[in-house]
Amino acid sequence: MSDLISYDDVIDAAYDIFLEMAPDNLEPADVILFTAQFEDRGAAELVETGEDWVEHVGFEVDKEVYAEVRIGLVNEENDVLDDVFARMLISRDPEHKFCHMLWKRD
């Protein structure tokens, strides 16, 4: 296996993919909200890889090779990312690019 992509680079890649795909996958009101409030409250953060990914991608997820990034808005009162617009599973292996996103649904 090749060297894995750093977690910082995973977060950057996830955010770039999110920005590209958000207009086609989120409600227009959510896109406007995220865009308007990202400067003050926006976040893309690495979290513990969820156990439910196997149900979404159809294979066992190696938590060393794959990372989960959540993208959304942070609650200013408790500094918690509680308005999640997307969850992304992304491969850290540069030889096997892969990502799968779960989008916020109202």
Curated annotation (Swiss-Prot):
InterPro entries per record: dsDNA_mimic_put (IPR007376), Put_dsDNA_mimic_sf (IPR036763)
Coiled-coil regions listed in the entry: none
Recorded family membership: Belongs to the putative dsDNA mimic protein family.
NCBIfam families, A to Z: PRK05094.1 (NF003469)
HAMAP family the record matches: Put_dsDNA_mimic
Record's function text: May act as a double-stranded DNA (dsDNA) mimic. Probably regulates the activity of a dsDNA-binding protein.
Name the UniProt record assigns to this protein: Putative double-stranded DNA mimic protein VP1949
Organism: Vibrio parahaemolyticus serotype O3:K6 (strain RIMD 2210633)
